[in-house]
Amino acid sequence: MKAYKRVIRQNPPYEIEFNARIAMTEVMSGSQSKKMIRRLKRMAASDKNKDYLDQVYYAIGNIYMSQKDTLNAISAYEKGNSGSTRNGIEKGVLLLKLGDIYWERERYNDAQRCYGEAIGLLDKERKDYEELSRRSKVLDELVPYTDAVHLQDSLQALAKMDEKQRNEAID
């Protein structure tokens, strides 16, 4: 922690300062997670960081994951994905993490979306690239069928409703 503060005090180029601030949040103790999230959200709101939103929200998502708060982690990762402007390795890492969460939760459509985009952003030399590639191919084949099952389930649920409930659901 002291080393990161020392780096920031030396007025380095902004990208180095930014990375030091992100790294500081990762080494803070778990009891300071609310403080870390507030600090990162302030960073996300700053115009200086608009090109780094994927990294900021990735760090926020990781804090939530360390607290076993998957719902808020997914929300943070999705914000990082939608706010990303550079489409670099950082976004690929974020999408891989998000895809893994969706895979574990059996939300295969969302996992396919994340893995499909991540595969084009990440280096083929990564140790987990083969697994990413395998999952992406499996999901490309699986998702059309799971989508059909979800559609049929929804249609059958609508068919079982009385007319008033069905009309409310449709509207």
Label each PLM-derived region with a short phrase.
Residues M1-D171:
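Acidic, polar-rich low-complexity tracts and alpha-helical solenoid repeat scaffolds
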